[in-house]
C-alpha cells in the first residue's frame, strides 16, 4: 500500500483504502505459508466465522473482509478505485499507466520496510503478479 498511494497521475489512493483492497489478496498469498495459514485460521476461529479446514477458515476471513469493504463502500481493486476512494466502473488509475509503472512499483514494494516482516518474501515476478491481482481483482493462485 505504501508504494501505490501516490504512484499514479490520476490521483492519490488513500492508504487505508489501499490496505483494505489489498488485504484479502495478501492473506491469500501469505496463506501458502503454513504458519501464516494457521494464524489466519486462528483469527477466523476467534471471531467465530466457522469453517472446518484451515482453507475454509481463511476463505471465510477473506469473505468477511470483502463484505466489510462493500459495507464501507471501498472497491475491491485498484481498477475500480474512483474519485474520493469510491467504487467506480472506471477508476482513477488507467490500466496502461498501471502496467507501465508496475515493475517499478513492485521493485519498490519489495524494498519497503514492511515487506521484510511478511511471512512470504515475494520476488519481483510474484510481487508483480500480486499487484495485478490487486488491480484486476483476480484470484491469487501462486
Residue ranges, per PLM feature:
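Short, amphipathic C-terminal "tail helix"
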Residues: 96-142
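Oxyanion-binding "anion nests"
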Residues: 1
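Gly/Pro-rich interdomain helix-loop hinge
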Residues: 4-97
